[in-house]
Curated annotation (Swiss-Prot):
One of the record's GO molecular function terms: oxidoreductase activity, acting on NAD(P)H as acceptor
Entry EC number(s): 1.6.5.-, 1.7.1.17
Stated name of the protein: FMN-dependent NADH:quinone oxidoreductase
Lineage, top ranks: Bacteria, Pseudomonadati, Pseudomonadota, Betaproteobacteria, Burkholderiales
Family: Belongs to the azoreductase type 1 family.
Cofactor note: Binds 1 FMN per subunit.
Length: 212
């Protein structure tokens, strides 16, 4: 099993999503001692947001400058790392109703025509099939239990849409919400998330056993 462990929280040791991704990866490795884990901390080493220099892979134009070649190499490294993974564990804190800009920058680098998706006469087709994604979703408030909250949520739904577009339909959510609503609320959120981790890791381990 090849695991790609991604964190994107900017709060360091205080991050709940980092705590949950670490616990998720630990559960995967405990059941698969031979698992290989690659770690990507987007708060420390995020790719630049796309611009005229870094979007060569989208236009198909060959790099003509050192800056363009350097940006193309970053995009290639990130998409190759993603495609090599069997399981992707993503820490996705809820910032202003959506994901962090660092995580969005990573998505923009791996969403590559001809690599992770393609357009066909029948419509778009994802090319990253067969992977499992586990999203550690953390929120200061509670958004999943009301119609108003769900209307404001563009985090989990966005990630499911993006990964689905890339061909990944096996997306599990490890959710801790209400973590900024007092100690009792945070404790309940973490307890619920730990149950999510057990279920998500068990499903991934079962799929790995079948594949083996």
């Amino acid at each position: 099993m090849q695991v790609l462990h991604i964190d994107s929280s900017i709060t360091g040791a205080a991050s709940v999503s980092r705590q949950l991704t670490a616990q998720t990866v630990a559960a995967l490795v405990a059941a698969n001692p031979g698992a290989k884990v690659e770690y990507l901390d987007l708060a420390v080493n995020a790719p630049d947001h796309l611009n005229a220099v870094s979007m060569g892979f989208r236009t198909g134009q060959a790099a003509t400058t050192e800056a363009e070649r350097a940006q193309n190499a970053i995009s290639e490294a990130l998409v190759s790392q993603f495609l090599a993974a069997d399981v992707v564990v993503v820490g996705a804190p809820f910032y202003n109703f959506t994901i962090s800009s660092q995580l969005k920058a990573w998505i923009d680098r791996i969403a590559q025509g001809g690599r992770t998706f393609r357009y066909t006469a029948a419509g778009p087709e994802g090319l990253a099939k067969g992977k499992k994604v586990i999203v550690a979703s953390t929120r200061g408030g509670v958004y999943s239990t009301s119609e108003m909250g769900q209307a404001l949520e563009h985090q989990e739904s966005y990630l499911k849409t993006v990964f689905g577009f890339l061909g990944i339909t096996d997306v599990s959510i490890v959710r801790a919400e209400g973590v900024a609503m007092g100690d009792e609320s945070k404790a309940k959120a973490l307890e619920s998330a730990r149950s999510d981790i057990v279920r998500a890791a068990a499903a991934a381990n079962q799929e790995a056993a079948i594949a083996a």
